[in-house]
Each structure stands twice: as structure tokens, then as C-alpha cells.
């Protein structure tokens, strides 16, 4: 990374990044393929290109040249055999260049991000704990109980391919790199379509190219979120203490001022509608939450301006169904695998004034999270652990594994679900899911041994599956010895958030 910093400092500009020359550097491909510099790189053979001991700049230049040449040949030559050979070679060429190109596009943002993290480490102790997904829920517990409304937002998708390039153009003004990116998108998608078709997205966003997909998607989502930050910053004289530093880009403020409603001549007047000091924004993947203490009218204004911003910036037609405004005390919202709501509890207090006494109900708001059973059952159906009615079925794909491996796989899924859903106030839904997985494991073992579940339990007993129901308090007592005392016991219904979870379980993620 220090070598990259020196390279960009030579230019003298934070935005005029010349990334294209890095495409011909050896260490880029070493990073892309997780190889050391003296490991497996390129060599040219008579039939195709594979990896070997030496890297050649001529090879990369030739790959790029042949990509452009074969693109024109495929339009001129009608020979089916030649076109089939061209397509086979193109897949290899694109895959080779894409892996290095993905790393190159991330370099300037990685430098700024790492420097920002280093600065925050000095201000925020234990900042690494904020990487945990569970770190979001203590924040919601602390903030949402004081708010009134929440907007459930789905970020617009799909998007026109040229918009993805224009989003990056605001950050990086290296024309050759952007032209190469546009060429990749043109080749792997139907350029005549206004949206990204699902069938043509399969190769570019395949498992081998997820890095480039995540980079493009995150840059697009960042552009969507910038509208919120811009409007909030312009509506306050004091900067919000909870807003993080964003990457500097060009032309954004000029574009944002041309939103249909927020025009330049009446900018301050329009932004006066957004003066709400209690507003919070959280996003995970394509879904975000915008919560406010303001009125329903204020939330409708936010919705209206977001819809106009999407239409003017990304050329989306009005999509009001992507933003739902709910009152926290009446509706719950699904976010990050939990069904969350703000519950109002009334406590009766006896008050006495002089000789008279009376009872008074005092309402208190409490943030509540439960495990939604229907999405989890749907995920179990997709994974073929049960049928649509919730009845456990065997897993034939795992029947060829050893008994220990089968039990370990089912047990790992149960432990991960219990670990992630430890913040639920009600565990009945989680117990049902664990019961389905336990019986599915038994059916899989019985299928393997060509026996029945009852005979299998009778012969071996049910103790071999007890790890599925390991008590949470026993696990915590091993981690925190102080919890062994009666005064520090974990009470029933008490929520526990872990700061070591950096990804959602696949079953939760698919729900």
C-alpha cells in the first residue's frame, strides 16, 4: 500500500488518478490471485494462456488488443466455428484482465479508507468492534425508543450500465480505465437494454468476478446515500457528530443542486423542511432504515425528495413502493434477520397528594426484536431441510458423508443461528427451527443407514444430538467466568449482542 501511495503522490491530485498504467504491473496480478511475486503468473502457450513463473507486459497488452480485435471480428465474420472459438478465447481474456482490473479500481479508495480508519482509531477506542453486524442493534436500542417514524427503503435496482460508469467518473477521471470498464460492461450485457437483464448478468457477477461487482454496487449505493448526507449537512449549521467522512468526489454538489424540488434559488427555503435533529440512517446491503422523531409529514418530504433524486440522478421513474413509512409504535419492520419494533409498556404508579391518592399509568418505550419464523422456514425450504409445511425432510446430498460430518454440519448451522439470534426477546421461533434441523439430521442419518428415525433413536439414543440445544448460559459461562455466580445469571428473555459477527448466516441472509 505504501508503494501505491508514492505512485499517486507523484500526480499531485487526489482525483486525477492514472490507473491504466497499473494494469501492466506484476504485483497487481499477484494481489488479484493471492500469489507471491515469484509464484504463478503468466506465460504464453501455443493453445491458450495459463499461469506460470514469469509475468510479461507483452502478454497483457496482447490480451487487451485481441479483445478489441475479436470484438470487431465477431461482427464481421459469420462463420459459426470461428465465432465459437472467439467466444471461448474472449472468456479467458476477460477473466484474466478483470481480476487485475478489479484490484486497480479499488486502490485509490483503499488508500483513503485506510487513512480514515487510522484517524478514527485514535478517537474511537475498540473501533474494530464496530465491524460486527450486531453492533447495529445496540445503537437501535438506544435511539429508536425515542423516535416516532421509520422509513423502510429498498435501494433502486437494476440500473442502467452507463450510470455505473458515470458514478465512477465523479471520482476517477482516468479516461482509459473508464473506457475499459465500459467495454467490459458492454461485452457481458445487452447494451441495447435499458436495464441489466438477469440472464446476461451471470458471467460478470459470477463467483470469480464478485469483487468487481461489489465495487460497482457499493459505489452506486454510496451515490444514493450521498443525497441524504448532502441534504442533512445543508440543513444544519453544525455538522452531525455521527456522520462519517466520505470520499471526496467531483461535480456532486452541482448535480445535487439540480434536484427538481430543491432548486438553487430557493435552496434554504426547501431545506428548512428537513430540520430534524433526531434522524438516523442505517443500511445493510440493498435495504436501509431512515428513522426520525419528526412528524409523518416530514417523513413524506424525505420520501418525495429521495424519489426525485433517484429520477434525476439515475433516471429511475417514480418508485414510491420502494419506501414505506410506518409508525414505530404500531408497525414492526424486518431488518437484518430480525423483526424489530418499539413496544409500549405501561407501569402503574400510585401517587399521593395531600390526603388524596390516585393511580397513574406511565408509558415506557422499549426496542424489541424477535425471530421471524416465516422467512426462516422459507430459507429452510430453499436449503431442502423441510417442506413448505415446515415438516423436516432428509438431506440426500449429505447422505454420502460420514456420520460425524453430517452431525457437524447440522450442528454448525444450529450454533450459528443461535449465535446470531441471541438478541431475540422470544426464542420460540428459534426453538422450532432448531427442532426442524435436528429431525432433518436424524432423517438424513436414517436414510444413510437405510433405517427409520425411531429405530435410529432407539439404537443410539438422542444424546448424540444434544449439541443442537447447547444452553446459551453454559456457553457464556465459559467465555465470562463472572456469569457463573447467581447474581450475574442471564435472565430469560434478556438480549445478548456479540461483537464478533461480521457476516449473516446464509439461512438468515436468504430469508
UniProtKB/Swiss-Prot annotation:
The keyword RNA-binding applies. One of its GO terms (cellular component) is chloroplast. GO terms for molecular function: RNA binding. It holds the Pfam family Intron_maturas2. InterPro entries: Domain_X, Maturase_MatK, Maturase_MatK_N. The keyword Transcription does not apply. It is found in: Plastid, Chloroplast. Keywords: Chloroplast, mRNA processing, Plastid, RNA-binding, tRNA processing. GO terms for biological process: mRNA processing; RNA splicing; tRNA processing. Usually encoded in the trnK tRNA gene intron. Probably assists in splicing its own and other chloroplast group II introns. Belongs to the intron maturase 2 family. MatK subfamily. This is Maturase K. It comes from Acorus gramineus.
Amino acid at each position: 500500500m505504501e508503494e501505491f501511495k508514492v505512485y499517486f503522490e507523484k500526480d499531485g491530485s487526489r482525483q486525477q488518478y492514472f490507473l491504466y498504467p497499473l494494469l501492466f504491473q506484476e504485483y497487481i496480478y499477484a494481489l488479484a490471485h493471492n500469489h507471491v511475486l515469484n509464484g504463478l503468473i503468466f506465460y504464453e502457450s501455443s493453445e491458450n494462456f495459463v499461469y506460470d513463473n514469469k509475468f510479461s507486459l507483452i502478454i497483457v497488452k496482447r490480451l487487451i488488443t485481441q479483445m478489441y480485435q475479436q470484438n470487431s471480428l465477431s461482427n464481421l465474420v459469420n462463420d459459426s466455428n470461428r465465432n465459437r472459438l472467439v467466444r471461448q478465447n474472449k472468456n479467458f481474456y476477460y477473466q484474466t484482465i478483470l481480476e487485475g482490473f478489479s484490484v486497480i479500481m479499488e486502490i485509490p479508495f483503499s488508500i483513503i479508507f485506510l487513512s480514515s480508519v487510522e484517524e478514527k482509531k485514535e478517537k474511537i477506542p475498540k473501533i474494530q468492534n464496530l465491524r460486527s453486524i450486531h453492533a447495529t442493534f445496540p445503537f437501535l436500542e438506544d435511539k429508536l425508543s425515542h423516535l416516532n417514524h421509520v422509513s423502510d427503503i429498498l435501494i433502486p435496482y437494476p440500473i442502467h450500465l452507463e450510470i455505473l460508469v458515470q458514478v465512477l467518473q465523479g471520482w476517477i477521471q482516468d479516461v482509459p480505465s473508464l473506457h475499459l470498464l465500459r467495454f467490459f460492461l458492454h461485452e457481458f450485457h445487452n447494451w441495447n437494454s435499458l436495464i441489466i437483464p438477469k440472464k446476461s448478468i451471470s458471467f460478470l457477477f459470477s463467483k470469480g468476478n464478485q469483487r468487481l461487482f461489489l465495487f460497482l454496487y457499493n459505489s452506486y449505493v454510496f451515490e444514493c446515500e450521498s443525497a441524504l448526507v448532502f441534504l442533512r449537512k445543508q440543513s444544519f449549521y453544525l455538522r452531525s457528530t455521527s456522520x462519517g467522512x466520505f470520499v471526496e468526489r467531483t461535480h456532486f454538489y452541482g448535480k445535487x443542486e439540480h434536484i427538481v424540488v430543491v432548486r438553487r434559488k430557493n435552496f434554504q427555503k426547501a431545506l428548512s423542511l428537513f430540520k430534524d435533529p433526531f434522524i438516523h440512517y442505517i443500511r445493510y446491503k440493498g435495504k436501509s432504515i431512515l428513522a426520525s422523531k419528526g412528524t409523518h409529514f416530514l417523513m413524506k418530504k424525505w420520501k418525495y425528495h429521495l424519489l426525485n433524486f433517484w429520477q434525476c440522478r439515475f433516471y429511475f421513474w417514480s418508485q414510491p413502493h420502494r419506501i414505506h413509512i410506518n409508525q414505530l409504535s404500531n408497525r414492526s419492520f424486518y431488518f437484518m434477520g430480525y423483526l424489530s419494533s418499539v413496544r409500549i409498556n405501561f407501569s402503574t404508579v400510585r401517587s399521593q397528594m395531600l390526603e388524596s391518592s390516585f393511580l397513574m399509568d406511565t408509558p415506557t418505550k422499549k426496542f424489541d426484536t424477535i425471530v421471524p419464523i416465516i422467512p426462516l422456514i422459507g430459507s429452510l425450504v430453499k436449503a431442502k431441510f423441510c417442506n413448505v409445511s415446515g415438516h423436516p425432510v432428509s438431506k440426500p446430498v449429505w447422505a454420502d458423508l460420514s456420520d460425524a460430518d453430517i452431525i457437524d454440519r447440522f450442528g454448525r448451522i444450529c450454533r450459528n443461528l443461535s449465535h446470531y439470534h441471541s438478541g431475540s426477546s422470544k426464542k420460540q421461533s428459534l426453538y422450532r427451527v432448531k427442532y426442524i434441523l435436528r429431525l432433518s439430521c436424524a432423517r438424513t442419518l436414517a436414510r444413510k443407514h437405510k433405517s427409520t428415525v425411531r429405530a435410529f433413536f432407539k439404537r443410539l439414543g438422542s444424546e448424540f444430538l444434544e449439541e443442537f440445544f447447547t444452553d446459551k448460559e453454559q456457553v457464556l459461562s465459559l467465555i465470562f467466568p463472572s456469569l457463573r455466580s447467581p447474581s450475574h445469571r442471564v435472565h430469560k428473555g434478556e438480549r445478548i449482542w456479540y461483537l464478533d459477527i461480521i457476516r449473516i448466516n446464509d439461512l438468515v441472509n436468504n430469508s
